[in-house]
Curated annotation (Swiss-Prot):
Main location: nucleus
SUPFAM superfamilies attached to this UniProt entry: RNA-binding domain, RBD
Organism name: Mus musculus
Biased segments, Polar residues type: 127-140
InterPro entries given in the database record: Nucleotide-bd_a/b_plait_sf, RBD_domain_sf, RRM_dom, U2B''_RRM1, U2B''_RRM2
Protein name: U2 small nuclear ribonucleoprotein B''
PROSITE patterns: RRM
Amino acid sequence: MDIRPNHTIYINNMNDKIKKEELKRSLYALFSQFGHVVDIVALKTMKMRGQAFVIFKELGSSTNALRQLQGFPFYGKPMRIQYAKTDSDIISKMRGTFADKEKKKEKKKAKTMEQAAAAANKKPGQGTPNAANTQGTAAPNPQVPDYPPNYILFLNNLPEETNEMMLSMLFNQFPGFKEVRLVPGRHDIAFVEFENDGQAGAARDALQGFKITPSHAMKITYAKK
């Protein structure tokens, strides 16, 4: 009997020598191009080695990922992908994380409401200038200088765990991709070379702001000639 499409996909036939954290980071980088990844479950027990679950927020994302990445060479082995027999909440409950996530959400909501109530109870003259000042300074948005179109892209704001394979998996889906060059001693920057300016530009536009990890949005500019 076929397994019905759901938000969670099951992956096996992966290289079981890869460390759990590196595996999860690489899976996130690969699968989040298809949509919002809620969670990745990779257990290092003997029974679960070389296997993982990727949980998407949208059903369409899991379907696209399954179709596009079936047989994708991942750390030297073709991935086998199918829909999971159980959906995301069940897996989260198995791991004991579902209730914790809900508690955190409720705590955050309660704290926000408390802060709003405290602000509303202040005297009219209080807090307003400070709030304005906070808004003016809290969220600076520094612009990354860009250079004229070039066949080489410059990446920055990369997380410490970035490796050549993670970046290659992201960029080799674009026509004209040639290679990724990391900078010795610098984990936060890299260069990606394409065959021409136009192909580099297409990849730049598509992956601008892509989050390799949830806290690091990649910044892409043309490299200086």
